[in-house]
Curated annotation (Swiss-Prot):
Remarks, miscellaneous: Carbon 2 of the heme B porphyrin ring is defined according to the Fischer nomenclature.
Compartments, record wording: Cell membrane
InterPro entries per the UniProt record, alphabetical: Protohaem_IX_farnesylTrfase, UbiA_prenyltransferase, UbiA_prenylTrfase_CS, UbiA_sf
Protein task: Converts heme B (protoheme IX) to heme O by substitution of the vinyl group on carbon 2 of heme B porphyrin ring with a hydroxyethyl farnesyl side group.
GO CC annotations, alphabetized: plasma membrane
Bilayer topology: Multi-pass membrane protein
Presence of the UniProt keyword Cell membrane in the record: yes
CDD domains from the UniProt entry: PT_UbiA_Cox10
Highest classification ranks of the organism: Bacteria, Bacillati, Actinomycetota, Actinomycetes, Kineosporiales
Reactions mediated catalytically: heme b + (2E,6E)-farnesyl diphosphate + H2O = Fe(II)-heme o + diphosphate
Membership in a protein family: Belongs to the UbiA prenyltransferase family. Protoheme IX farnesyltransferase subfamily.
Enzyme class, UniProt record, top EC level: transferase
EC number: 2.5.1.141
Record protein name field: Protoheme IX farnesyltransferase
Length: 339
């Protein structure tokens, strides 16, 4: 039997409502139960994943695919990501309760029971597979199912609590969306989607590690060995810079291996340099921080805030969004290279 969070069961009605509505800027949602189920899917992560899917479809088609194909791929991908994220919430509900960043997730507060979450995830997974098989193709369905298994089994169950490299290899699941977008159009794979797969794989550490620096104490209290928990800030920031350099170089490979034009190539170079400058700035701040603290430990949360890691976190989102836009636009304004 599921025991609901006492903040919900023992609090007055208005307190319970405010807790349920905290995710909506303090206002209670009109349909709190539906809002709780949506929260399980981590919609912001779903949005970020789908930002890469549709541009890849446009690039693969060399223009605009059918609206129906875009819609069914979008919905199928969103349902698959929602399934994986819900299962992640199910298996991580014990550590989510220990972290301030995640303590208001529905399985922690008792808004949704573990059994209800499992049923919900199963329905999402079945619906995703059915949509891909019926309206897209079997290869895309297999890749979507593979992404779910990689995220839930590979990342959540095997890696997250065991290694500081958890998000590096766990990030493979997030890379699958570009393969799904490509196969939805081509029903086959080529070098181009694997280049973009590599970009997102190398983008994942510079995206998640700054967030982990900001919430280092949360992860430490929950016993999750994120790299910022077990390593000094300079070690983390150095790794972020190295991954960013590799990511920028990988993004440029879409020109010779994927036939991308000048628009994409110029955007990839400019955006890459801009983001690299941000990560180098983070490393410099981390180095100063280590000198100030004498390198004794990673410091307190207030000290870590001086490194300003969230600027790089938000910068990574901007980078991926604009790079994806360049992927989408390139087929429509294809300008060939003079060599």
């Amino acid at each position: 039997m599921t025991v609901a969070d006492p903040r919900l069961t023992d609090a007055p009605a208005h307190s319970r409502t405010s807790l349920l509505g905290r995710r909506r800027g303090g206002r209670p949602p009109r349909f709190p139960r539906a809002a709780a189920y949506v929260a399980l899917t981590k919609p912001r992560i779903v949005e970020l994943l789908l930002i890469t899917t549709i541009p890849v479809m446009l690039f693969a088609a060399g223009g605009l695919p059918s609206g129906w194909l875009i819609l069914t791929t979008f919905v199928g991908g969103a349902l698959a990501a929602g399934c994986a994220n819900t299962l992640n919430c199910y298996f991580d509900r014990d550590i989510d309760a220990l972290m301030k960043r995640t303590e208001n997730r529905p399985l922690v507060t008792g808004e949704v029971s573990p059994r209800q979450a499992l049923v919900f995830a199963t329905v999402l997974g079945i619906a995703s597979t059915a949509i891909f098989v019926a309206f897209v193709n079997v290869l895309s369905a297999a890749l979507a199912l593979g992404a779910i298994l990689l995220y839930v089994v590979g990342y959540t169950l095997l890696l997250k609590r065991r290694t500081s490299q958890n998000i590096v290899w766990g990030g493979v699941a997030g890379c699958m969306q570009v393969l799904i977008g490509w196969t939805a159009v081509r029903d086959s794979l080529d070098w181009a989607p694997f280049v973009l797969f590599g970009v997102i794989f190398l983008w994942t550490p510079p995206h998640y590690w700054p967030l982990s620096v900001r919430y280092r104490e949360d992860y430490a209290n929950a016993g999750v060995p994120m790299l910022p928990v077990v390593a000094k800030p300079t070690t983390v920031s150095r790794q972020i810079v190295l991954y960013t350099i590799a990511m920028v170089l990988c993004s440029l490979l879409l020109v010779p291996l994927g036939g991308a034009g000048v628009v994409y190539g110029a955007a990839a170079l400019v955006l890459g340099i801009g983001f690299l400058v941000q990560t180098i700035g983070l490393h410099r701040r981390a180095t100063r921080f280590e000198v100030e603290t004498g390198g004794r430990d990673a410091g307190t949360l207030e000290q870590l805030k001086r490194i300003s890691p969230m600027g790089v976190f938000h910068g990574s989102i901007t980078y991926l969004t604009l790079l994806s836009a360049a992927v989408a636009v390139d087929p429509f304004v294809r300008v060939g290279w003079p060599f």
